[in-house]
Amino acid sequence: MAIMSDKWIKEAVINQSMISPFAEKQVRVHNKEKIISYGLSSYGYDARVSNEFKIFTNINSTTVDPKNFSEYNLVDREVDVCIIPPNSFALGRTIEYFKIPRDVLVICVGKSTYARCGIIVNVTPLEPEWEGHVTLEFSNTTPLPAKIYANEGACQFLFLKSDQICDTSYADRQGKYMKQVGVTLPLT
């Protein structure tokens, strides 16, 4: 597997609609204000988080169960700045919609701007032929409230192209998160 360059990413966007919307260069300023960057980089793509968040709460005294997940664990917010309570967790989603080619696996890493503030972004790999909005998991590891800025960069996707096509893609096995739109909760 090889990591793919900005040139390859641009071609995949043009020929396969791999990322939509797509920023062809790094965007660091919006309306004359500095922002957390997003857009195409040398060997990846920095995606933005939308203004749709689900923040974990304990007001309903529920238990987090991945096999029987309750929406009562969360508070929904549509905001420009999401404040995650200390040592807590929130879900968001990318603005960008991804369509992954059959011979590509995508890995996501966090942005250093957030990591240096104790905010960790986690995403499981985007598998071959998966498509949808990516649900982002934000963990505030600090004892202080932490801000996540909607419509700004949140994470970087790295595209790994295989020299072999997989026998069974995510689409072939009808994966449960296929074509997800919005913040998607755990499914079993």
From Swiss-Prot:
Its EC number is 3.5.4.13. The keyword Hydrolase applies. Pfam families: DCD. GO terms for molecular function: dCTP deaminase activity; nucleotide binding. It catalyses: dCTP + H2O + H(+) = dUTP + NH4(+). The keyword Transferase does not apply. It comes from the Bacteria. One of its GO terms (biological process) is dUMP biosynthetic process. This is dCTP deaminase. Pathway: Pyrimidine metabolism; dUMP biosynthesis; dUMP from dCTP (dUTP route): step 1/2. The active site is at 137 (proton donor/acceptor). Keywords: Hydrolase, Nucleotide metabolism, Nucleotide-binding. Belongs to the dCTP deaminase family. Homotrimer. Catalyzes the deamination of dCTP to dUTP. DCTP binds at residues 111-116, 135-137, 156, 170, 179-180.
